[in-house]
């Protein structure tokens, strides 16, 4: 059985486990702050865009959109927290279905329902929260992941 990462209470314990696996993954003993030169706080250039740090929010499906695929207060609160987190890359913060019958669950965001106004609301929510918490969002990128769940679609599944 593979142990959960949270089980390791120190860098030494994780290092010992990795040694037993014959893994050469380097582990730092302490977590550096941005002021101490953390590599995670360094800018990252991708193509012509430079992102202010290396923290990223990945796409999720929160099962908390409206039944017609629009944002709810719960969903907007999550997006606000994305901004407050300090991550400069929100890489598809939400998986958004392109058509209703391609939704992975009945409470997934739906692109036709969102429309331009809904997309703008999501982007403005994360960007304004980031500016309030960190001063500027000029070096951040916000994107959505457009999805179709194919044979795994469950647009009418029961409550979770």
Regions from the language model: what does each represent?
Residues 1-160:
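Flavin-dependent oxidoreductase catalytic cores
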